[in-house]
């Protein structure tokens, strides 16, 4: 539980944008310790991000003070009759036109249509009362099918909701911790949301905490490079440099300072560059390290000793097939059909490779 809350706090502090309109709700969220309150304040923070994002895109002012429509008009110096208590998510008063914004998130078409009709009717019920005061109502209902917003990356949004859902495990009230509708909406969003980002796209969003030497290396690599050169220009430049070098070498302007070397000698010299290191690594040890350091490679290439089967089935192929089936059974790649096909291709490729190697051994 503490680890889940710590992960939520880390996401809130590091990956949700610093906006003054979110500061109050972020403080309320970060100040909670009980799972029930962390869950409620986390959902409020997520809803606040969506409301502000919708207000910004609609050109409205976010109603962070939870003002009613009547209070908004009174603060603007407009006398109006008594109005039903309606607290919009956003508003904007332009001359005699009042823009009211309502936003919501629903994952299923049925609940989306129901909520859209409810919000539309709620705003329409005060249209005639506002007309008496000379105010023209402009209602805006912003309905969304997901929780994406501009204040956090998509993978942070998904992870944040997933961690909030995990907090239900530590509560005895389960979905009664908050409204039942909120519980089902959270379940639907986690069930229907498919992360659109691949692993590399998500890695690119992470903060770059590398040292300055990386920038210096990239600057040295790109310094003096002309990006406007075509492939023919590059080939022509290389050929001209090589022709000049060849001509000067044949004419005697350049001394022949070449010597024959062996690959083994080069590797030995390279391994002895750092005198402080006492490790004597050879090629055999270096080739074994990648296999031994990877549990997956150890599982595939392991040599088992025990009772041998009478069949000619290749054990290495069977281990590979078993491993791929286990990966597919996890249902992690259900939305990546091409990657699933790649896993299927690995099985016949491995079998063909083993058959060829076995045939060569028999010959």
From Swiss-Prot:
Binding positions for Mn(2+) 1 per the UniProt entry: 51, 89, 102
Catalysis: reaction(s): RNA(n) + a ribonucleoside 5'-triphosphate = RNA(n+1) + diphosphate
Pfam family, one: Arena_RNA_pol
Residues that, per the record, bind Mn(2+) 2: 89
MF-aspect GO terms: hydrolase activity; metal ion binding; nucleotide binding; RNA-directed RNA polymerase activity
GO biological process: viral genome replication
Transmembrane segments: none
Superkingdom to which the source organism belongs: Viruses
Co-factor note (free text): For endonuclease activity. Binds 2 Mn(2+) ions in the active site. The divalent metal ions are crucial for catalytic activity.
Enzyme Commission no: 2.7.7.48, 3.1.-.-
Residues the record marks as active site: 115
Endonuclease as annotated region, ranges: 26-287
Major localization listed first in the record, in broad terms: virion
Keywords annotated in UniProt: Host cytoplasm, Hydrolase, Magnesium, Manganese, Metal-binding, Nucleotide-binding, Nucleotidyltransferase, RNA-directed RNA polymerase, Transferase, Viral RNA replication, Virion
Subcellular localization(s) per the UniProt record: Virion; Host cytoplasm
GO-annotated cellular components: host cell cytoplasm; virion component
Keyword Metal-binding attributed: yes
Cofactor(s) recorded in Swiss-Prot or TrEMBL: Mn(2+); Mg(2+)
Family as reported in the entry's similarity comment: Belongs to the Arenaviridae RNA polymerase family.
The record's note on its domains: The N-terminus contains the endonuclease activity (endoN). The central region contains the RdRp activity.
Subunit structure: Homomultimer; the oligomeric structure is essential for the polymerase activity. Interacts with nucleoprotein N. Interacts with protein Z; this interaction inhibits viral transcription and replication, Z partially blocks the product exit tunnel for the releasing nascent RNA product.
Misc: Classified as His(-) endonuclease since it does not have a histidine upstream of the active site that coordinates the first cation. His(-) endonucleases display very low activity in vitro, although they are clearly active in vivo.
Physiological role: RNA-dependent RNA polymerase, which is responsible for the replication and transcription of the viral RNA genome using antigenomic RNA as an intermediate. During transcription, synthesizes subgenomic RNAs and assures their capping by a cap-snatching mechanism, which involves the endonuclease activity cleaving the host capped pre-mRNAs. These short capped RNAs are then used as primers for viral transcription. The 3'-end of subgenomic mRNAs molecules are heterogeneous and not polyadenylated.
Name of this chain's protein: RNA-directed RNA polymerase L
Organism this protein belongs to: Lymphocytic choriomeningitis virus (strain WE) (LCMV)
């Amino acid at each position: 539980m503490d680890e889940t809350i710590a992960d939520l706090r880390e996401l809130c502090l590091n990956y949700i944008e610093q906006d003054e309109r979110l500061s109050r709700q972020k403080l309320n969220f970060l100040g909670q310790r009980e799972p029930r309150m962390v869950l409620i304040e986390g959902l409020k923070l997520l809803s606040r991000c969506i409301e502000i994002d919708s207000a910004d895109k609609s050109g409205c002012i976010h109603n962070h003070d939870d003002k009613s429509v009547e209070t908004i008009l009174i603060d603007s110096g407009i006398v109006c009759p008594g109005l039903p208590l309606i607290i919009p998510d956003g508003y904007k008063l332009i001359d005699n036109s009042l823009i009211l914004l309502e936003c919501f998130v629903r994952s299923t078409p049925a609940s989306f249509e129901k909520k859209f009709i409810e919000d539309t009717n709620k705003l329409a019920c005060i249209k005639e009362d506002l007309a008496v005061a000379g105010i023209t109502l402009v209602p805006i209902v912003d309905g969304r099918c997901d929780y994406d917003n501009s204040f956090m990356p998509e993978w942070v949004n998904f992870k944040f909701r997933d961690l909030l859902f995990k907090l239900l495990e530590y509560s005895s009230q389960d979905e009664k911790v908050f409204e039942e509708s909120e519980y089902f909406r959270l379940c639907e969003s986690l069930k229907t949301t498919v992360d659109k980002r691949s692993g590399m796209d998500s890695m690119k969003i992470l903060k770059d905490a590398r040292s300055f030497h990386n920038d210096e290396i990239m600057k040295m690599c790109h310094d003096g490079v002309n990006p406007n050169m075509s492939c023919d220009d590059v080939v022509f430049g290389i050929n001209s440099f090589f022709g000049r070098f060849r001509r000067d070498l044949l004419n005697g302007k350049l001394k022949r300072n070449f010597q024959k070397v062996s690959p083994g000698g080069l590797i030995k010299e390279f391994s002895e560059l750092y005198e402080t290191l006492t490790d004597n690594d050879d090629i055999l040890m270096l080739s074994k390290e990648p296999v031994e350091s990877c549990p997956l490679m150890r599982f595939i290439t392991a040599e088992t000793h025990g009772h041998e089967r009478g069949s000619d089935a290749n054990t290495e192929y069977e281990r590979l097939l078993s491993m791929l089936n286990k990966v597919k059974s996890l249902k992690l790649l259900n939305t990546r059909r091409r990657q699933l096909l790649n896993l299927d291709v690995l099985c016949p490729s491995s079998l063909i490779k083993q058959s060829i190697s076995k045939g060569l051994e028999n010959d």
